[in-house]
Amino acid sequence: MLGVNYGVSFSNMYFSPSKYNLSPVFSTDYVSITYTKHSKMFGSIPNFALVLGLATGTEGFSFSENPETGYTDNYDDVQQCRIRVIEAPAMMQFHADADPFKFMANAGVYGGWRQSISRSGPQLSKEWTDSFRDYEKRLDYGFQGGLGFALVFAPVELHFNCTVRWSWSSLNEPDYDSKYYYKYAYPLDIMATAGLHFHLTKRRGKTNRELKKEAYEIVYGKKN
C-alpha cells in the first residue's frame, strides 16, 4: 500500500541542564510518503505490517517571556529556532480491522538530516541566523511511533494519525562549551496527519470459517 500524508507539527526541545518557559513551535509543513507491507508475524498472526517512508518537516523550540520577571530565556543566544529536516522512518505496525475501520499502532526508528536552520534572538550574531555552527550536529535519528485509525474503502484508505518523533541526536556536541559540564538539546515533536493510501494489490480478508480452519490446522495439523 502506498500513501501520501500531510499534517501539522508541534515542536519542542528537551534541554539538559533544564530550560524554562518553553513554547512549542507550530508548523504546517509536514509531508510524508509511506509504503506499507502487510504480513503475518510468525507466519500465523495477520495483524502486522512494515511501514517505510520518506518525510520532511520541522524541528525547533521557542522561549516565552517570564510573566513575573519579564526575562526571556535563550540557548546559545537563540530564543526562537526552526530546523528543516528530512527523514526516513521504519516502523512495525499492529492493526485491528473492524470494517470499515482500521485501528493502528506504530513503533520504530528513523534516520534523517537537518537540512537548514532559521533562528533569532536579540544577542544572536547575524552570522548564525540561518547557518549551522561547527559544533552543531546535522545527522538526526531516534524513535518514532504513534496511534491512528483509517476508513477503508478498497482500494483506498483514509488515514488519521498522531505521531511522536523523539530525536536521540542532540542538536550540539555535548562538550562544545565545557569538557566538564555537558549540554544536550534533544528535539521532541508531535505530528497530526491525514493521508490518502492506495492498495497496490487486491485486499482480501478471510471469513470466520477460514480463520477457524487455519487456527485448527496450526494446533492439530492438517487433516489427511
Report the location of each language-model feature:
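Predominantly the C-terminal beta-signal and adjacent terminal strand-loop region
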Residues: 140, 145-224
